[in-house]
Amino acid sequence: MPFLHGFRRIIFEYQPLVDAILGALGIQDLERQEPLDDSASSEESRILVLTELLEQKAHSPFYQEGVSNALLKMAELGLTRAAAVLLQSGANLNFEDPVTYYTALHIAVLRNQPDMVELLVRHGADINRRDRIHESSPLDLASEEPERLPCLQRLLDLGADVNAADKNGKTALLHALASSDGVQIHNTENIRLLLEGGADVKATTKDGDTVFTCIIFLLGETVCGDKEEAPMINRFCFQVTQLLLAHGADPSECPAHESLTHICLKSFKLHFPLLCFLLESGAAYNCSLHGASCWSGFNLVFERLCSHPGCAEDDSHIELLHKAETVLDLMVTSSQRLQLPENLNIHPVGSLAGKIQALHASLRQLESYPPPLKHLCRVSIRLCLRPWPVDTKVKALPLPDRLKWYLLSAHSDTQDTC
């Protein structure tokens, strides 16, 4: 078996040379290695000992395998001077660890050694090479942990292909998103760096995963997961969504289960802040590819209202109604001419059924008449103030308070058509 054969070669063939190289550098145990004396004289003496050793062993059997394996150790420890000597002495940049199949460049990234990364690339290491087991490129590995941000920056500076994908279509941006849990791993800065480096927000894997797949999954975790973790996850999802939309991502595309806007509309009470941000940032409240015939925000909001019978003293239902009014108002002020879906039929029940019917009737009335001038002005001003936060920008306008009050979301009477 190739794996066992490679492992045997470490023990019986070139491991003695590797041990001698490590010993020359004062390294006895990689797992328990104390920081080396980094004074100039001490480092020079170690490099001198290493150089002499390599000259003595230059014609020994399995010499190149030994120095190449030792290069992996230098990459792990970030010993750039020693690595440079090994490279000059014949170390192979493409040599793979017999167990992990990582090259020195992969290992340098995993250990967050940006100077080592640059040294290896400058000496000809393939900056986009993928390992044989996971098909991960150095950029993929750098994107997966916040601590590897320095390596991520260095790789991008050195020309790594930010949109290179593995055989399944997964790019470094999708790696950064998929590796984030919103609690312990926050890859926000990694994601920001990749986007600023030109990462494609439309990247999609063969399984259909998009840049919003991770966010949708994490939002689902807030519903049935740890209540203490939910605020952290929501904050992470909000920040990443901001970044994605700023770089042109469309949260309203099909299919519906991969549409962040659709998910937030369906559970608008739970994801209210994020939904308001999406709508204020210009996200379509219908399917952006096929329109309302595919799915419509108006249908989703009223379906949610009608599925909650409630009672007169039910605070949760009153809160739901207030949030629905705000969301509907944001949708109304997203376009100068309101066009409701043809199949928007509602059948509310419970004590608040009358208010839901009135809300529906006000929208139908607004649709059936030419929009009043003040509505057109409100829509135009709010569109000019995009992106989010529109309400904050409204409050900063040099306008009378009454006019600001009308411009703010959910503060105008949707039944007023004069």
Curated annotation (Swiss-Prot):
Q: What positions does the domain SOCS box occupy?
A: 358-413
Per its record, how is this protein called by name?
Answer: Ankyrin repeat and SOCS box protein 6
A Pfam family recorded for this sequence: SOCS_box
**Family named by the database record:** Belongs to the ankyrin SOCS box (ASB) family.
Keywords associated with the record: ANK repeat, Cytoplasm, Repeat, Ubl conjugation pathway
What InterPro entries does UniProt report for this protein, alphabetically?
A: Ankyrin_rpt (IPR002110), Ankyrin_rpt-contain_sf (IPR036770), ASB6_SOCS (IPR037327), SOCS_box (IPR001496), SOCS_box-like_dom_sf (IPR036036)
On the tree of life, the source organism's domain of life is Eukaryota
Tell me, how does this one assemble? Answer: Binds APS. Identified in a complex with ELOB and ELOC. Interacts with CUL5 and RNF7. Interacts with SQSTM1.
Free-text domain note? The SOCS box domain mediates the interaction with the Elongin BC complex, an adapter module in different E3 ubiquitin-protein ligase complexes.
* Localisation: Cytoplasm
Instruction: State the function annotated in the UniProt record.
Output: Probable substrate-recognition component of a SCF-like ECS (Elongin-Cullin-SOCS-box protein) E3 ubiquitin-protein ligase complex which mediates the ubiquitination and subsequent proteasomal degradation of target proteins. May play a role in the regulation of cell proliferation and autophagy by promoting the ubiquitination and degradation of SQSTM1.
Q: Spans of the ANK repeats?
A: 65-95, 100-129, 134-164, 168-203, 224-253, 258-287
Cellular component, GO annotation: cytoplasm
Q: What is the lineage of its organism?
A: Eukaryota, Metazoa, Chordata, Craniata, Vertebrata
- Gene for this chain: Asb6
Q: Does the keyword Cytoplasm apply?
A: yes
Q: Which GO terms describe its biological process?
A: intracellular signal transduction; protein ubiquitination
Q: In which pathway does it act?
A: Protein modification; protein ubiquitination
What PANTHER family is this protein classified in?
ANKYRIN REPEAT AND SOCS BOX PROTEIN 6
Under the heading SMART domains, the entry gives:
ANK (SM00248), SOCS (SM00253), SOCS_box (SM00969)
- Record organism: Mus musculus
Task: List the expressing tissues.
Answer: Detected in adipocytes.
